[in-house]
């Protein structure tokens, strides 16, 4: 009888601990979603307000060419940020079975345009963005260029956001032959920024996850970037490796299979 009582007590304690863990998980998930919605509300309003403000200034000063150009650039930067945010949300909520795009595109053009946006972001933050290597055997590929932009922009964007004025971000792109006509694109991004703790790295690819949750807004984001990166890399059969330490920067290495194409890229929509 004593042994049965002890077994029963052990089961009750184990069950109680399991319940406590489930409550902790549910509470953490609820807090993360609350933070996400609060940050999203701010991050959506901020670029919209910037765009509206810049358009109003342009309307009042149409003859001031320098001011108009400056306002246009700021409005375009805010619009790109808003579009990237919307794309991230749509990507996370897209069914995995949804067909992936198979559009001919020029990889060099896509990378240069993406890097142009990242350079503007880096300049604004006082961070030096350097392209150390851009070695491509092919110009044209078949696929969805948006996914490549999202992967690279989210990783480079985080490297800039969590850096400091005077810091640096170095990235490289190198294509290599694989098998059966498929090539591999290796993308490496390293920085000397804040880095990530071992604890955070265990769940850094979860949606809403942030090392510093109080760093929302245009500089800190809402914790979707790395979740989007992991989803896109996995969907395309790629790999991602991370080497980071708190206060010592971060190094990302992404390898993606790529299909070369002889077809001409489609013209961009106006």
Model-derived regions, located:
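Primarily the dimerization/phosphotransfer
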Residues: 15-60, 79
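Short alpha-helical segment of the dimerization/phosphotransfer core of two-component systems
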Residues: 74-82
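Conserved micro-motifs of the catalytic ATP-binding
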Residues: 95-103, 140-143
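Conserved catalytic submotifs in the C-terminal HATPase_c
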Residues: 103, 112, 123, 128-139, ...
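Short conserved segment of the HATPase_c
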Residues: 196-208
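Short alpha-helical Gxxx[C/S/T] motif in the catalytic ATP-binding
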Residues: 220, 225, 229
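Detector for a conserved hydrophobic position within an alpha-helical segment of the HATPase_c
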Residues: 232-233
């Amino acid at each position: 009888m004593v042994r049965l009582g002890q077994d029963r007590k052990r089961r009750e304690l184990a069950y109680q601990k399991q319940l406590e863990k489930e409550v902790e998980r549910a509470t953490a998930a609820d807090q993360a979603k609350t933070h996400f919605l609060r940050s999203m509300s701010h991050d959506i309003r901020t670029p919209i307000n910037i765009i509206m403000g810049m358009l109003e200034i342009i309307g009042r000063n149409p003859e001031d060419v320098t001011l108009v150009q400056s306002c246009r650039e700021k409005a375009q930067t805010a619009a790109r940020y808003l579009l990237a945010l919307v794309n991230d949300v749509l990507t996370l909520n897209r069914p995995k079975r949804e067909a992936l795009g198979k559009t001919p595109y020029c990889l060099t053009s896509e990378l240069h345009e993406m890097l142009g946006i990242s350079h503007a972001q880096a300049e604004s933050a006082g961070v030096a963005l350097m392209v150390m290597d851009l070695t491509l055997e092919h110009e044209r590929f078949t696929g969805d260029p948006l996914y490549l932009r999202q992967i690279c922009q989210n990783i480079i964007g985080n490297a800039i956001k969590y850096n400091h004025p005077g810091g640096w971000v170095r990235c490289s792109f190198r294509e290599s032959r694989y098998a059966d006509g498929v090539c591999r694109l290796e993308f490496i991004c390293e920085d000397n920024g804040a880095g990530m703790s071992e604890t955070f790295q265990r769940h850094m690819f979860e949606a809403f996850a942030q090392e510093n949750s109080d760093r929302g807004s245009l500089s800190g984001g809402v914790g979707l970037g790395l979740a989007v990166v992991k989803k896109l890399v996995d969907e395309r059969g790629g790999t991602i490796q991370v080497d980071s330490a708190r206060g010592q920067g971060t190094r990302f290495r992404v390898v993606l299979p790529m299909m070369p194409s002889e077809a001409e890229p489609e013209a961009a929509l106006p």
